[in-house]
């Protein structure tokens, strides 16, 4: 059942069903209140009598194990109740992971590392959120690694990132992204530089696995790893590489039997490969919608949101003070490479970038590396700025930055293909 609901009404949900709604119109606002019973949004429990607000772009699925009554008011493009939901299978996956965690705790071993894989638009990041929320609700402190450089659930697009999850996600805003570990990649698809992507994933896996050992509670909690939706050809090779790099204990495959069978064949026999259905509420996103989503994440990085607004700074930097580089030189045949080097080494080479008008709107990554002699690929990110103006006459650029001028001493900036049109009034 689909309906155009622009008024207040109550929805009565039976056990193991969910209310799904979408908001597509700008400036639309929907308020949801749990009246009676128990309900959750992607693993986060709703508090009775508390009003939750959702805005444009929201795709919501409120699930109940025992039945509930929800009061909903506002303008929605789609709203219906579904009894066809994979949530029972998802909580069974949580129960299996929790069994692994208990065993790891008893033996003082690392907890389970699970990769969430599948094609685009099957609900991978949603399943990650559900499993992470269930884990912290039983006292765990798992790590969340996001290898999806196209959308970015933790950082902005063009990066891989990891955060420690200590409390359930906010119903309205998701997880608190405090002190993330972020590594620069600089592209929105791994295929733009396959060699660099694998190197960045390997470094993130190495550092993340080591960090598990720093805290006993986190050690046994393990890691939930979100992956890209590119699952064929080189994309599939990236999934296998990630499984090896993270020493995955399990791989949860969403909605693609062929991928499931390929992984059963290609991963070690001690890795549990599980095929799971996607939710019927998952919506396929167009290229335009993906682009808008990337832009929105960058906008929130600089300007925050209506609940927590940020006020970024804009300042001029002369070309001569801009230490700007790009990772990945143009490909050369092996015969043209210096002795002892291979063509793929060029893909990880740090090369200087000369400022030109083409820099306009590009995101620049501020690295903690101070010199190109440092391990730039393996050095985490301090933050981001955006080029809002290039003045060739003045030999300068204007940067949008979360921090005021000047740039830190010895600031090393890395070019990214990610762009942001700063139209903020």
Curated annotation (Swiss-Prot):
<dbReference type="InterPro" id="IPR045116">
    <property type="entry name" value="Clp1/Grc3"/>
</dbReference>
<feature type="binding site">
    <location>
        <position position="18"/>
    </location>
    <ligand>
        <name>ATP</name>
    </ligand>
</feature>
<dbReference type="GO" id="GO:0005849">
    <property type="term" value="C:mRNA cleavage factor complex"/>
</dbReference>
<dbReference type="InterPro" id="IPR032319">
    <property type="entry name" value="CLP1_P"/>
</dbReference>
<dbReference type="Pfam" id="PF06807">
    <property type="entry name" value="Clp1"/>
</dbReference>
<dbReference type="InterPro" id="IPR010655">
    <property type="entry name" value="Clp1_C"/>
</dbReference>
<dbReference type="GO" id="GO:0005524">
    <property type="term" value="F:ATP binding"/>
</dbReference>
<dbReference type="Pfam" id="PF16575">
    <property type="entry name" value="CLP1_P"/>
</dbReference>
<dbReference type="GO" id="GO:0031124">
    <property type="term" value="P:mRNA 3'-end processing"/>
</dbReference>
<comment type="similarity">
    <text>Belongs to the Clp1 family. Clp1 subfamily.</text>
</comment>
<protein>
    <recommendedName>
        <fullName>Protein CLP1 homolog</fullName>
    </recommendedName>
</protein>
<dbReference type="InterPro" id="IPR032324">
    <property type="entry name" value="Clp1_N"/>
</dbReference>
<dbReference type="GO" id="GO:0006388">
    <property type="term" value="P:tRNA splicing, via endonucleolytic cleavage and ligation"/>
</dbReference>
<comment type="function">
    <text>Required for endonucleolytic cleavage during polyadenylation-dependent pre-mRNA 3'-end formation.</text>
</comment>
<keyword id="KW-0539">Nucleus</keyword>
<dbReference type="Pfam" id="PF16573">
    <property type="entry name" value="CLP1_N"/>
</dbReference>
<dbReference type="InterPro" id="IPR028606">
    <property type="entry name" value="Clp1"/>
</dbReference>
<feature type="binding site">
    <location>
        <begin position="121"/>
        <end position="126"/>
    </location>
    <ligand>
        <name>ATP</name>
    </ligand>
</feature>
<dbReference type="InterPro" id="IPR038239">
    <property type="entry name" value="Clp1_N_sf"/>
</dbReference>
<dbReference type="GO" id="GO:0000214">
    <property type="term" value="C:tRNA-intron endonuclease complex"/>
</dbReference>
<dbReference type="GO" id="GO:0051731">
    <property type="term" value="F:polynucleotide 5'-hydroxyl-kinase activity"/>
</dbReference>
<dbReference type="InterPro" id="IPR038238">
    <property type="entry name" value="Clp1_C_sf"/>
</dbReference>
<keyword id="KW-0507">mRNA processing</keyword>
<feature type="binding site">
    <location>
        <position position="59"/>
    </location>
    <ligand>
        <name>ATP</name>
    </ligand>
</feature>
<dbReference type="InterPro" id="IPR027417">
    <property type="entry name" value="P-loop_NTPase"/>
</dbReference>
<keyword id="KW-0067">ATP-binding</keyword>
<keyword id="KW-0547">Nucleotide-binding</keyword>
């Amino acid at each position: 059942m689909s309906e155009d609901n622009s008024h207040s009404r109550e929805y009565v949900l039976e056990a193991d069903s969910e209310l799904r709604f979408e908001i597509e119109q700008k400036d639309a606002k929907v308020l949801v209140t749990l009246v009676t019973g128990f309900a959750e949004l992607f693993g986060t429990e709703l508090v009775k009598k508390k009003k939750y607000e959702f805005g444009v772009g929201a795709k919501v699925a409120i699930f109940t194990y025992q039945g509930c009554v929800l009061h909903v008011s506002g303008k929605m493009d789609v709203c219906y109740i579904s009894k066809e939901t994979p949530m029972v299978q998802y909580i069974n996956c949580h129960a299996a992971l929790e069994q692994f965690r208990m065993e790891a705790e008893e033996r003082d071993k690392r907890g389970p590392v699970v990769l969430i894989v599948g094609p685009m638009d099957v609900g991978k990041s949603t399943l990650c959120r559900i499993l992470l929320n269930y884990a912290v609700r039983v006292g765990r402190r798992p790590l969340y690694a996001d290898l999806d450089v196209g959308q970015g659930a933790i950082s902005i697009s063009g990066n891989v990132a990891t955060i420690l999850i200590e409390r359930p996600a906010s119903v309205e805003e998701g997880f608190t992204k405090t002190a993330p570990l972020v590594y620069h990649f600089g592209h929105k698809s791994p295929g733009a530089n396959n060699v660099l992507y694998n190197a960045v994933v390997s470094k993130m896996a190495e550092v993340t696995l080591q960090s598990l050992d720093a805290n006993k509670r986190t050690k046994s909690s393990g890691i939930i790893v979100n992956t890209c939706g590119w699952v064929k050809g080189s994309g599939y090779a990236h999934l296998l590489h990630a499984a090896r790099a993270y020493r995955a204990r399990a791989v949860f495959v969403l909605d693609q039997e062929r991928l499931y069978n390929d992984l059963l064949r290609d991963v070690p026999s001690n890795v549990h490969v599980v095929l799971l259905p996607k939710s019927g509420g998952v919506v396929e996103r167009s290229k335009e919608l993906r682009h808008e989503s990337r832009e929105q994440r960058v906008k929130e990085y600089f300007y925050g949101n209506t609940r927590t607004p940020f006020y970024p700074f804009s300042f001029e930097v002369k070309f001569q003070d801009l230490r700007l580089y790009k990772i990945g030189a143009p490909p050369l045949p092996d015969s043209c490479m210096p002795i002892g080097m291979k063509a793929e080494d060029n893909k990880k080479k740090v090369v200087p970038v000369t400022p030109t008008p083409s820099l306009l709107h590009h995101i620049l990554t501020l690295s903690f590396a101070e010199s190109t002699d440092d391990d730039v690929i393996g050095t985490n990110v301090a933050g981001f700025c955006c080029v809002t103006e290039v003045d060739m006459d003045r030999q300068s650029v204007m940067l949008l930055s979360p921090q005021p001028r000047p740039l830190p001493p010895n600031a090393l900036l890395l070019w990214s293909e990610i762009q942001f049109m700063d139209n903020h009034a």
